[in-house]
Amino acid sequence: MKNNILFCLFFVLISCNDNSGSVSRDYNEPGTPLILISIDGFRWDYFDKTETPNLDELIESGVRSEGLIPSYPSKTFPNHLSIVTGSYPNNHGLVANRMYDEVFDEYYYIGQGSTAARDGKWINREPIWVTVENQSLRAMTMFWPTSDAEIMGVRPSNWFAYDESITNTQRMEQLLRWIELKGTKRPTFLASYFSDVDDAGHIYGPDTEETKEAIRSVDYEIGILINGLKDRGIFDEVNIMIVSDHGMTENYTDQVIFLDDYIDISTLELIDQGVFVPIRIEDHLPSKIDALFSSLENAHPNMHVYKKNGFPESFHLTDNRRIQDLTVVADDHWRILTHESFNPNRFPKGDHGYDPQYESMHGIFVGHGPGFKSGYIGPRIQNIHLYEMMCKIMDIIPASNDGNPSITTTFLQD
């Protein structure tokens, strides 16, 4: 009886927090549902670290890639948005987790309670749930990064503002409730998100027992979804995609580059620190930029400095106004800090954001359902190609994007 009361209380609570979309429209009958789930920070080789029976089940009768290559920078919000827009960060607008925009004269930052992260004005490309809604189908999202923002005047039919107190099990149960809806109320696209593996990787490092436990825990939650679909007799009638935004690499306190050992930072604004440091020079004088660039260019063998339009071509960062005058970038495992910000007692054991050429930054793509082949392992692919694939699976017309639909056809049923 007590358990029944608790479940009812949760259902009432979560229903009250369930928000409806901002546009009134007539909806069409739904197509085959697609469920998209992100396991933040799940590195491509984590399948080999510990037991993942539920993910293994999806792979055995579905598909996976050898790895999912993130866009630069391999950070959480830029890559979640790259996955759902098919666009490089330069084009979709989120070039980092923390940014400054001179036109807005505002800072963008992430975290529970961030108002900027829920403001769609920062986003310049159409996410998949907007594409779905614009074609008179329903999208419903639970905690996918940026899905609680109104973007281009559109929200999912149902969505949740991020609340870390809502357990992973409750998230899966919500997806199952949504998919039980009938007729035109039923969603064609559903999405959710797990942070556990990323959290453990940061705190303990990628190759630790704590991270392995987080992997097993999230796999268990995937099992709740699988079994819930089986109980409803629709497991093989639903397309499922499991992805991650990036991987994870080890960080060490003896692999820190102190920026203030090489330049005077007293008149500079460091927008962020860690894997890379965007440097804002208030007056943007070319002479100041050139002088700082010269001081940093060969300052440390594991640190690289780029002017606003001087990034490697593979980074696909060119003309976005949120890119600062200079950006210093660390090699794999290294961090760039100031002496003031360095705290060995609060130092991450793992991090991401590095050049996607490092395999440690690669994530996962797993697909299962009537739209995918069975028992197929394919090549590594860039995450910008998934948007076109999702559109094809749902039989909808994609918006403008940077992806190539031919890249992912190898994973799909003929």
Give residue ranges: language-model regions.
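C-terminal motif of bacterial Sec signal peptides marking the signal peptidase cleavage site
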Residues: 13-15
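Active-site-proximal N-terminal segment of extracellular/periplasmic enzymes that hydrolyze or transfer
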Residues: 19-64
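Metal-dependent active-site segment of extracytoplasmic phospho-/sulfohydrolases and closely related
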Residues: 36, 54, 217-258
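Short, structured active-site-proximal loop/turn typified by the sulfatase FGly-forming signature C/S-X-P-X-R
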Residues: 47-92
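His/Asp/Glu-rich, glycine-adjacent segments
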Residues: 87-88, 92-205
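A long, amphipathic alpha-helix that forms part
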Residues: 169-180, 197-238, 290-291, 390
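Active-site neighborhoods of enzymes that stabilize oxyanions during catalysis
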Residues: 272-377, 381-389
